[in-house]
Amino acid sequence: MRLDLSKDKINLDALFVKQQKIDFDNGDSLLKIAINMPDINFLDIEIYETSINRLINKTHKYQLSNLKIIQVDAHTKDNNFDSFQLFLSGPWYKKKYHKLRLVQTAFLDLLSKTIIHNGKIHIATDWVRYVTTMMNALKNHLHFKNTQNDPIYSLRPGHRPITKFERRSHRPGHDVLDLIFKNEK
């Protein structure tokens, strides 16, 4: 199902009956999660038409009713999601592009409003410098608390599939680190 959105905020209660999760991805890992967790609804936010069409075709192939795809900025009402997932997003490793990194204070402020109390943020990356930046932003944010004490990184949960970017990065010195924080607003 392709959603046609106006300037109004997305009303997920009208789309789904059950709890929702939000994900930014090329769709492959989210598709696997949606297949394995049919009782949970997922919203994929994608900007590339080819990825959208491919994912729509796969949702029809697997007859998934718990996965929706949108091609816009995610304008939703507050307390609308129980979790947010970001797996191996672009690290923008050159210093002049660091401002383009998604996980920064302003973005975390938006997430803290959108995610329910005790909802989770789950991020995975293979770039050590980026994970340090993300960890600092999350640790210093008023509303987010790490679910881990020591070690500070989480093991990859069994429900998180290995993404295509993760498969490419599986080589010595390129460990994928998972960060799972809870929203304590």
From Swiss-Prot:
Substrate binds at K94, D126, T163, K164, F165, E166. InterPro entries: SAM-dependent_MTases_sf (IPR029063), tRNA_(Gua-N-7)_MeTrfase_Trmb (IPR003358). S-adenosyl-L-methionine binds at E46, D73. Keywords: Methyltransferase, S-adenosyl-L-methionine, Transferase, tRNA processing. GO terms for molecular function: tRNA (guanine(46)-N7)-methyltransferase activity. Its EC number is 2.1.1.33. One of its GO terms (cellular component) is tRNA methyltransferase complex. It is an enzyme of class 2 (transferase). It comes from the Bacteria. It catalyses: guanosine(46) in tRNA + S-adenosyl-L-methionine = N(7)-methylguanosine(46) in tRNA + S-adenosyl-L-homocysteine. Catalyzes the formation of N(7)-methylguanine at position 46 (m7G46) in tRNA. This is tRNA (guanine-N(7)-)-methyltransferase.
